[in-house]
Swiss-Prot record:
PANTHER family: INOSITOL 2-DEHYDROGENASE (PTHR43593:SF1), PTHR43593. It comes from the Bacteria. It catalyses: myo-inositol + NAD(+) = scyllo-inosose + NADH + H(+). The keyword Thylakoid does not apply. Keywords: NAD, Oxidoreductase. Its EC number is 1.1.1.18. This is Inositol 2-dehydrogenase. Involved in the oxidation of myo-inositol (MI) to 2-keto-myo-inositol (2KMI or 2-inosose). The keyword Cytoplasm does not apply. GO terms for molecular function: inositol 2-dehydrogenase (NAD+) activity; nucleotide binding. The lineage of its organism: Bacteria, Pseudomonadati, Pseudomonadota, Alphaproteobacteria, Rhodobacterales.
Length: 334
C-alpha cells in the first residue's frame, strides 16, 4: 500500500520534502498540499508533486491524507500538529514543534490522551552518520563525558534574523542533538556576548556563546556565529575521562594546487545534512505505515522548547545562570 502524504507548507523545505518522498524514498506519494501562498503550492505541484491536489487549508490536507508533514511557518505548527493528533494521523513536524514551551506541552498532553505516539519532530542531526558514530564513540570508548565544545556557524543570515532567532532557529539543533548524544538533561543555561562582528546589524547580537550544564555535571559551550562569512560549519568535540572525539567533517576532496593544500567548506546547510533528511523521512514513513511515529518525539520537542525559552531569557540577562527545569517524563516517552 502506498501511503498518501499531505504537506502543509510548501516553501523551500516543504517542497524539498515533497521531492524526497516522490523521487528518492519508497512507500509513499505526496497527494495533497496547501500553503498560505498559493503560488508556492502551485510551484511545488508543478515541479515535484504532479499527482497532488492543492487544498485550501491544513484541515483539508489532514482529512485527505494518511499522514502529514507540517512544514509551515513556525507559529502555525502547534495548531496544525494538534489537528493531526485529533484526527489520529501520524505527523512529521519540522522544528520548532511550537514557538514556546507551553504550546509544545499541549501537544505532549494531546498525544498522551491518544495513548500512542503520532508525532516525529524534524531534528535530523540524530540521523547524521557523523553524529551516530560520535555517539557510539562516546558510549564505548571515552569514559564518562566531561565537556563538549561545539560551534554552529552560518556564512550569513537575512536582515529579518534577530537575536532570539539564534536560539529558536539555530541553537535548537544543538539543544536536541547534544541532549541525545549524552543521554542527559539540561539543568542550567547562560548566554554571554563576545565582541560583535561588523557584519551584523542593529537587531542581532552576533556572535553569542551559550553555556549549558547537564544533570550529570557535563559542561557544554556552544558558539553561535551566524555571519562568519566563510561557510556553513558545524563543530562538536566531546572531552571524556579517557580521551576526546570530534564530529567528522563532511566528505570533500582534498587538493594540492597552487602551492596550497586544502578542501572546500560547504556554504549551504541543506548540503551539510542532505543524507540525514532522507533517512529521517524514511523512518517516519515506515512508522506512519503502522499508524504511529518514530524518531525524535513530541517530548523531545518539548524538552528543546523549555531549554530554548530559558536560553532566550538568558540572552536578556547576559552572564546570569538560569535554571532549566523539566517536568517528569510521561510513560509514553520512556
Amino acid at each position: 500500500m502506498t501511503l498518501r502524504i499531505g504537506i502543509i507548507g510548501t516553501g523551500a523545505i516543504g517542497t524539498d520534502h515533497a521531492r524526497r518522498i516522490n523521487r528518492v524514498l519508497s512507500g509513499a506519494e505526496v497527494t495533497a498540499v496547501t500553503d498560505v501562498n498559493r503560488d508556492n503550492a502551485e510551484a511545488c505541484v508543478a515541479g515535484v508533486a504532479p499527482g497532488a491536489q492543492i487544498l485550501g487549508s491544513a484541515e483539508e490536507v489532514i482529512a485527505a491524507s494518511d499522514a502529514v508533514l507540517v512544514c509551515s511557518w513556525g507559529a502555525a505548527h502547534e495548531a496544525q500538529v494538534l489537528a493531526a493528533i485529533a484526527a489520529g494521523k501520524p505527523c512529521f513536524c519540522e522544528k520548532p514543534l511550537a514557538t514556546e514551551a507551553y504550546g509544545a506541552r499541549r501537544i505532549v498532553e494531546a498525544e498522551g490522551a491518544m495513548g500512542r505516539r503520532l508525532v516525529q519532530v524534524g531534528f535530523m542531526r540524530r540521523y547524521d552518520r557523523g553524529y551516530i558514530a560520535l555517539k557510539e564513540t562516546v558510549r564505548t570508548r571515552l569514559g564518562p563525558p566531561l565537556m563538549i565544545h561545539a560551534a554552529h556557524r552560518n556564512p550569513t543570515v537575512p536582515g529579518r534574523y534577530r537575536t532570539p532567532m539564534a536560539i529558536h532557529d539555530t541553537l535548537i539543533h544543538e539543544i536536541d542533538v547534544l541532549r541525545w548524544l549524552l543521554d542527559d538533561e539540561y539543568v542550567s543555561a547562560q548566554v554571554i556576548f563576545p565582541r560583535a562582528t561588523r557584519h551584523t546589524h542593529a537587531g542581532l547580537r552576533d556572535p553569542q556563546i551559550v553555556l549549558l550544564e547537564t544533570a550529570k555535571g557535563v559542561r557544554i559551550d556552544v558558539e553561535i556565529f551566524v555571519n562568519c562569512r566563510y561557510g556553513y560549519d558545524i563543530q562538536c568535540e566531546v572531552v571524556g575521562e579517557e580521551g576526546t572525539a570530534r564530529l567528522p567533517e563532511p566528505m570533500a576532496i582534498p587538493t594540492r594546487l597552487g602551492a596550497m593544500f586544502g578542501q572546500p567548506i560547504l556554504m549551504d546547510w541543506k548540503d551539510r545534512f542532505i543524507d540525514s533528511y532522507d533517512v529521517e523521512l524514511q523512518d517516519f514513513l515506515k512508522a506512519a505505515a503502522q499508524g504511529t511515529a518514530a524518531g525524535p518525539s513530541a517530548w523531545d520537542g518539548y524538552a528543546a522548547a523549555i531549554t530554548a525559552d530559558v536560553c532566550v531569557q538568558a540572552q536578556e540577562r547576559p552572564g546570569a545562570i538560569l535554571p532549566v527545569t523539566l517536568p517528569a517524563r510521561p510513560a509514553l516517552y520512556a
